[in-house]
Regions:
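Class I (Rossmann-like) S-adenosyl-L-methionine-dependent methyltransferase catalytic domain
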Residues: 1-15, 32-36, 40, 50-112
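Conserved acidic residues
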Residues: 18
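Hydrophobic adenine-recognition pocket in adenosine-nucleotide-binding enzymes
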Residues: 25
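Helix-to-beta-strand junctions that scaffold the AdoMet/dcAdoMet cofactor pocket
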Residues: 29-30, 45-47
Protein backbone atom coordinates (compact mmCIF):
# COMPACT_ATOMS: atom_id res chain seq x y z
CA UNK A 1 0.00 0.00 0.00
CA UNK A 2 1.23 3.45 -0.93
CA UNK A 3 -0.31 6.68 0.24
CA UNK A 4 0.27 9.87 -1.70
CA UNK A 5 -0.53 13.32 -0.45
CA UNK A 6 0.20 15.51 -3.41
CA UNK A 7 -1.31 17.98 -5.84
CA UNK A 8 -3.77 15.80 -7.74
CA UNK A 9 -3.48 17.96 -10.86
CA UNK A 10 0.32 17.78 -11.01
CA UNK A 11 0.79 14.20 -9.76
CA UNK A 12 2.69 12.03 -12.25
CA UNK A 13 3.17 8.49 -10.92
CA UNK A 14 5.88 6.28 -12.35
CA UNK A 15 3.56 3.27 -12.39
CA UNK A 16 -0.09 2.24 -12.43
CA UNK A 17 -2.16 1.16 -9.43
CA UNK A 18 -4.63 -1.60 -8.57
CA UNK A 19 -6.69 0.79 -6.45
CA UNK A 20 -7.06 4.55 -6.47
CA UNK A 21 -9.09 5.93 -3.56
CA UNK A 22 -10.00 9.59 -3.35
CA UNK A 23 -12.09 11.10 -0.57
CA UNK A 24 -12.54 14.76 0.22
CA UNK A 25 -11.48 16.06 -3.18
CA UNK A 26 -13.98 15.59 -6.00
CA UNK A 27 -16.88 17.18 -4.13
CA UNK A 28 -14.94 20.45 -4.24
CA UNK A 29 -14.71 20.29 -8.04
CA UNK A 30 -17.21 21.57 -10.58
CA UNK A 31 -18.35 19.06 -13.17
CA UNK A 32 -15.85 20.09 -15.86
CA UNK A 33 -12.88 19.82 -13.49
CA UNK A 34 -14.23 16.57 -12.01
CA UNK A 35 -14.30 15.03 -15.50
CA UNK A 36 -10.83 16.30 -16.35
CA UNK A 37 -9.27 14.88 -13.18
CA UNK A 38 -11.20 11.61 -13.41
CA UNK A 39 -10.00 11.08 -16.98
CA UNK A 40 -6.42 11.83 -15.94
CA UNK A 41 -6.49 9.51 -12.94
CA UNK A 42 -8.02 6.66 -14.95
CA UNK A 43 -4.72 6.58 -16.81
CA UNK A 44 -3.00 5.70 -13.51
CA UNK A 45 -5.26 2.68 -12.97
CA UNK A 46 -4.17 -0.82 -13.99
CA UNK A 47 -6.38 -2.95 -16.19
CA UNK A 48 -8.61 -4.84 -13.75
CA UNK A 49 -8.12 -2.13 -11.12
CA UNK A 50 -10.70 -0.11 -9.24
CA UNK A 51 -11.11 3.58 -8.53
CA UNK A 52 -13.26 4.80 -5.64
CA UNK A 53 -14.28 8.45 -5.41
CA UNK A 54 -16.11 9.86 -2.42
CA UNK A 55 -18.65 12.65 -2.82
CA UNK A 56 -21.27 14.13 -0.50
CA UNK A 57 -24.81 13.21 -1.54
CA UNK A 58 -27.79 15.51 -1.88
CA UNK A 59 -29.01 13.91 1.37
CA UNK A 60 -26.76 15.86 3.74
CA UNK A 61 -28.61 17.03 6.86
CA UNK A 62 -25.71 19.30 7.87
CA UNK A 63 -25.42 21.09 4.53
CA UNK A 64 -27.02 24.32 5.77
CA UNK A 65 -24.63 24.47 8.73
CA UNK A 66 -21.66 23.75 6.48
CA UNK A 67 -22.62 26.51 4.08
CA UNK A 68 -23.32 28.92 6.95
CA UNK A 69 -19.66 28.37 7.85
CA UNK A 70 -18.60 28.98 4.20
CA UNK A 71 -17.95 25.29 3.54
CA UNK A 72 -19.40 24.84 0.07
CA UNK A 73 -19.28 21.51 -1.75
CA UNK A 74 -20.80 20.06 -4.90
CA UNK A 75 -23.38 17.65 -3.50
CA UNK A 76 -24.29 15.05 -6.12
CA UNK A 77 -26.82 12.29 -6.64
CA UNK A 78 -25.87 8.72 -7.59
CA UNK A 79 -27.31 9.42 -11.04
CA UNK A 80 -25.09 12.49 -11.48
CA UNK A 81 -21.99 10.50 -10.53
CA UNK A 82 -22.90 7.75 -12.99
CA UNK A 83 -23.49 10.31 -15.76
CA UNK A 84 -20.17 12.03 -15.09
CA UNK A 85 -18.35 8.70 -15.33
CA UNK A 86 -20.22 7.78 -18.53
CA UNK A 87 -19.33 11.18 -20.00
CA UNK A 88 -15.68 10.24 -19.42
CA UNK A 89 -16.09 7.17 -21.61
CA UNK A 90 -16.60 4.61 -18.86
CA UNK A 91 -19.10 1.86 -19.60
CA UNK A 92 -22.07 1.87 -17.24
CA UNK A 93 -21.32 -1.84 -16.65
CA UNK A 94 -18.09 -0.72 -14.93
CA UNK A 95 -19.77 1.85 -12.67
CA UNK A 96 -21.40 1.37 -9.29
CA UNK A 97 -22.40 3.93 -6.67
CA UNK A 98 -22.64 2.92 -3.02
CA UNK A 99 -23.24 4.89 0.15
CA UNK A 100 -22.49 4.56 3.81
CA UNK A 101 -25.38 3.66 6.13
CA UNK A 102 -26.65 7.23 6.61
CA UNK A 103 -26.60 7.96 2.87
CA UNK A 104 -24.66 11.19 3.33
CA UNK A 105 -21.47 10.04 1.61
CA UNK A 106 -21.54 8.40 -1.80
CA UNK A 107 -18.75 6.30 -3.26
CA UNK A 108 -18.39 6.08 -7.02
CA UNK A 109 -16.76 2.72 -7.86
CA UNK A 110 -15.22 2.41 -11.30
CA UNK A 111 -13.63 -0.80 -12.52
CA UNK A 112 -11.26 -0.85 -15.46
Amino acid sequence: IEFHRDNAFKFRPSRQYDLIWSAGLFDYLDEKTFKMLLTKQLGFLKEGGEMVIGNFSLNNPTRDYMEFGNWFLHHRSPEELIQIACDCGISEDNINVKSESLGVNLFLHISK
